[in-house]
């Protein structure tokens, strides 16, 4: 849901395929649990902080310090 990852080619209604893993590296697109809600964002770790970055300038970065990484996005499926 949502348009926060349009710049990464993930559109509303797309299905994401996720490799379940608790760790991810800087720059990977992840599914993270934040405030009891799953979100798809780009992981950024900088100066000891963790950020969940949208790929749409209309959305703000999320302080991901308390977020739990659920997995890494490995594919996107779009229905036509």
Question: Where do the PLM segments sit?
Answer:
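Acidic/glycine-rich C-terminal interaction modules and beta/coil loop segments
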Residues: 1-80
């Amino acid at each position: 849901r949502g348009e926060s990852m349009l710049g990464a080619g993930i559109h509303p209604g797309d299905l994401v395929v996720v490799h379940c893993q608790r760790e991810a590296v800087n720059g990977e697109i992840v599914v993270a649990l934040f405030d009891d809600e799953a979100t798809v964002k780009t992981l950024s770790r900088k100066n000891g902080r963790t950020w969940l970055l949208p790929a749409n300038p209309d959305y703000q970065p999320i302080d991901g310090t308390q977020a739990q990484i659920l997995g890494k996005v490995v594919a996107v499926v779009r229905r036509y």
